């Protein structure tokens, strides 16, 4: 069922390159329940990519909608309302490349041209079909993008006031330690929750890009949520 995800060089270049903005994005994940029930799902890079996308979206308060066939009508009604109330909405789609995925995509394309597929967060019947389908959507001028680039664009386009708010700081930290925000005590060392050097560097880069003056060394002097919030308020 699973196959090695294609490398960038194997995929047709994206012919549509409108700017992705976190404030306009809506993430659709199609058929995740089917994928999660497949043997060996937890060891797949695809599982990691979908989880990373979902966590980054939640950290930046981007709506995430899970779509499965049993709730299709209800979810599409909800999505239709969101798209009609926001003419700048951008729909980012990932998940199981099934007939349901293609049906959802056609419905969305009938409402907006701002549709992008996450090209390393979908599962086709085979690697060859995956590559061919990305080539087809490129030919149809539908944007495709990989997980890392999308997450970077989301973070870079998020409003500074949101990123540096107490809620924004909490959500970013929660994403990096893989916990629900309510689980993080403000005075407990974040290393106890699993914060590592990679997570620290990401957070420092994110906050500096939004105007904060902060170094990894300063953050690690007292790596608690409370201390970080105080540092970022200066």
Predicted regions, residues:
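Active-site-adjacent betaalpha module
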Residues: 1-26, 68-161
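Short acidic, Gly/Ser-rich segments with clustered Asp/Glu that frequently serve as metal-coordination loops
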Residues: 32-42
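Von Willebrand factor
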Residues: 42-44, 49-70
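Anion (oxyanion) recognition and catalysis
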Residues: 51, 55-59, 108-113, 138, ...
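Thiotemplate assembly-line natural product biosynthesis machinery
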Residues: 159-183, 202-209, 230-233
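Phosphopantetheine carrier-protein modules
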Residues: 174-193, 210-218
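Phosphopantetheine-attachment site and its flanking helix in carrier
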Residues: 188-211, 227
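AMP-binding/adenylate-forming catalytic domain of the ANL superfamily
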Residues: 212-230
């Amino acid at each position: 069922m699973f196959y090695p995800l294609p490398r960038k060089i194997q995929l047709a270049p994206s012919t549509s390159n409108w700017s992705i903005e976190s404030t306009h994005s809506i993430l659709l994940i199609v058929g995740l329940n089917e994928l999660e029930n497949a043997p060996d799902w937890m060891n797949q890079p695809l599982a990691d990519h979908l989880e990373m996308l979902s966590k980054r979206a939640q950290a930046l308060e981007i709506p995430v909608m899970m779509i499965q066939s049993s709730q299709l009508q209800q979810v599409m009604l909800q999505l239709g309302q969101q798209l009609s109330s926001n003419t700048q909405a951008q729909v980012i789609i990932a998940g199981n490349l099934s007939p349901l995925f293609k049906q959802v995509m056609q419905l969305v394309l009938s409402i907006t041209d701002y549709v992008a597929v996450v090209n390393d967060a979908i599962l086709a019947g085979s690697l060859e079909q995956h590559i061919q389908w990305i080539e087809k959507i490129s030919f149809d001028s539908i944007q495709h993008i990989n997980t890392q680039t999308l997450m970077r664009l989301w973070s870079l386009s998020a409003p500074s006031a949101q990123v540096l708010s107490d809620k924004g700081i909490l959500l970013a930290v929660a994403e990096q330690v893989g916990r629900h925000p309510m689980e993080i005590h403000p005075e407990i060392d974040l290393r106890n929750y699993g914060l590592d050097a990679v997570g620290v560097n990401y957070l420092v880069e994110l906050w500096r890009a939004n105007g904060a003056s902060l170094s990894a060394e300063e953050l690690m002097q007292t790596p608690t949520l409370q201390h970080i919030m105080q540092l970022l308020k200066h």
